Amino acid sequence: MKTWVIKIGTSILRGTEETSTEEVIETLSRSFTSFLSKGNKIILVTSGAVGLGCQKLNIETRPNDLSTLQATAAVGQVNLMSLYDKVFNKLGHNIAQILITKADFNSRKSFNNASKTLKKLIDLNVIPIVNENDTVANEELKYGDNDTLSALVALAINANKLILLTDIENLYSKDPRNNNDAQPIKEVHNSELKEIKDKNIKNSNNEWGTGGIATKLISAEIATKGGVEVQLVDGTNKKNLIEIFNDNKIGTLFYPVEKPIRNKKSWLSHAIQTVGKITLDDGASFAIKRKGASLLAVGVKDVEGNFTINQAVKIVNTNDKEVAKGLVSISSDKLRSILNNKENNNSSIIVVHRDVLALS
């Protein structure tokens, strides 16, 4: 049995002058049927609520202000789920709506609850349809058109594959719209991904979505580090949908790492939001990266932000490069007090224990 997470972008769902959103969803859902009939499972991560809300309210351009974005998302989400329910009902499939924000994944307990719920739904042969809760979110609306969310969902359920359906054929060496010499990239191994992601790739934003190629590369990096294969595919081509479910190599394949980060450390690395930053000296940086040591107060050079026990912090070296994330054992006030030599006897206190420290 295979479990796949399929992310459907706004550029796919919005359709064209000739094809409605309902027709797009019907084409997509029919392509899933053969895959599901073999006992496989899918979870959909969908965008499109804002776009559909704008259509319903006759708003011609995507709003810029947050309150209007959230209002259109509220209207559009009802329409979006109604379309999914109508189409999947015809094919004899039950669906479930799951609305998530990044804050929901910030708690380990909430992350585990979401994981258990998603797994139970697919055990019951229900197709979960996940979207960011845009009506209450703020940063989420600007963050990545559900690309990052789809990667986190894939990690939460230990998916075999994450499929990113978009409106481009593959990843390219350059933006193909502006560069005639742009070359398609068919395969990306994890050792290459960071360099590709960090290059100055022009974002392929369009008016109705909030994502682009950069967010898809971030999503691919998160998923592959957690052991999930990622496939970037042009979802506007109906033939591609057949090829995907025959497990053919189309679009761009991102291969997972050989030794993935799983469970709690995967959550620490990718799902949790940090509230502060700790700068290490060279010795401490070496100890946690090469020796798997806990972070001690003696190795801390600087502290930024305010945090309390069990909150997450970013841990950087003297060049401000992130080396890890972790949950602190002491507050920022206590740590600053130690650094200011007010408590010399506590310089060996554990700031972040190795069990709750995830290397970047």
From Swiss-Prot:
EC id: 2.7.2.11
Highest taxon above the source species: Bacteria
Binding residues annotated for substrate, in chain numbering: S47, D134, N146
SUPFAM superfamilies for this protein: Carbamate kinase-like, PUA domain-like
Location of the PUA domain: 275-356
Keyword Acyltransferase on entry: no
Root EC class: transferase
Compartments it resides in: Cytoplasm
Reactions catalysed: L-glutamate + ATP = L-glutamyl 5-phosphate + ADP
GO biological process terms on file: L-proline biosynthetic process
Pathway the protein takes part in: Amino-acid biosynthesis; L-proline biosynthesis; L-glutamate 5-semialdehyde from L-glutamate: step 1/2
One term under GO cellular component: cytosol
GO molecular function annotations of the record: ATP binding; glutamate 5-kinase activity; RNA binding
Pfam families: AA_kinase, PUA
Keyword terms: Amino-acid biosynthesis, ATP-binding, Cytoplasm, Kinase, Nucleotide-binding, Proline biosynthesis, Transferase
CDD domains: AAK_G5K_ProB, PUA_G5K
Family stated for the protein in its record: Belongs to the glutamate 5-kinase family.
Role according to the record: Catalyzes the transfer of a phosphate group to glutamate to form L-glutamate 5-phosphate.
Name by which UniProt lists this protein: Glutamate 5-kinase
Gene from which the chain derives: proB
